[in-house]
């Protein structure tokens, strides 16, 4: 079940968006957005492989083809693959660091 916070974030996305979810945590936002065809594509990222483990498990269980990438912010993301960035569930200083 998607939290109210994640539902609000998803409601801001468009069906033509190519999204990267930075710090995806459990991957619920991406799984929901792809399953419901709310975005064109999504890439799930987190800073460490261990942080991606739950998202990787959830994506596998969803039977969806969603890429998961270890990345510090946008460092390992090809800009041509995305047009929308989601950064949520982190403190202000962390978000500002990622955006810089």
Predicted features along the sequence, with ranges:
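Conserved SAM-binding motif I beta-strand of class I
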Residues: 41-46
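S-adenosyl-L-methionine
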Residues: 49, 53-80
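A short, conserved alpha-helix within the catalytic core of class I
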Residues: 93-100
């Amino acid at each position: 079940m998607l939290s109210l916070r994640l539902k609000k974030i998803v409601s801001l996305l468009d069906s033509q968006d190519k999204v990267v979810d930075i710090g995806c945590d459990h991957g619920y936002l991406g799984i929901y957005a792809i399953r419901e065809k709310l975005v064109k594509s999504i890439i799930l990222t987190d800073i460490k492989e261990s942080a991606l483990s739950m998202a990787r498990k959830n994506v596998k269980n969803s039977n969806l083809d969603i890429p998961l990438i270890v990345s510090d912010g946008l460092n390992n993301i090809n800009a041509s693959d995305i047009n929308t960035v989601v950064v949520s569930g982190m403190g202000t200083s962390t978000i500002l660091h990622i955006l810089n």
